[in-house]
């Protein structure tokens, strides 16, 4: 997957930008047509030319994995009980009932910020212990939950 490759090679800003653009395009097509499509045209805001309506297919990654991992910046490592939260959005965002392995359930919230360099205000609730690494434009902080 392109986004994963960009992230693994350190191009976090570009991965976030591409993910945000793709997510916005899928949302716009959904709003215009009232359905999710199997695939989308790469250069216009419409379904792909051989796309089936009411068929999630790969599009299902956009409102789940792409939203959580690349827009919200959540990168879980369950075996190590570690969660990296790479905060790039300025808007308030978060996830309720975020599954963390077979037994973990997290509630994650990040308050709105006025600029990327501003330290994020994070609220987390968890039913298990973990290490949370928060990354933002001007810093990094590790918390034990």
Residue ranges and their predicted role:
Residues 1-145:
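Non-catalytic C-terminal accessory modules of carbohydrate-active enzymes
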């Amino acid at each position: 997957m392109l986004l994963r490759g960009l992230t693994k090679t350190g191009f976090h800003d570009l991965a976030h930008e591409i993910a945000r653009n793709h997510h916005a395009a899928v949302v716009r097509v959904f709003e215009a047509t009232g359905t999710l499509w199997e695939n989308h045209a790469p250069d216009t805001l419409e379904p792909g030319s051989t796309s089936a309506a009411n068929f999630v297919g790969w599009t299902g990654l956009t409102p789940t994995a792409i939203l959580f991992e690349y827009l919200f910046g959540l990168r879980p490592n369950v075996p190590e009980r570690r969660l990296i939260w790479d905060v790039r959005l300025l808007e308030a965002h978060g996830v309720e009932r975020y599954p963390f392995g077979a037994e973990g359930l997290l509630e994650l919230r990040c308050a709105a910020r006025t600029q990327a360099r501003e330290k994020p205000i994070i609220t987390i609730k968890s039913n298990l212990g973990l290490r949370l690494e928060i990354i933002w434009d001007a810093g990094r902080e590790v918390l034990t939950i």
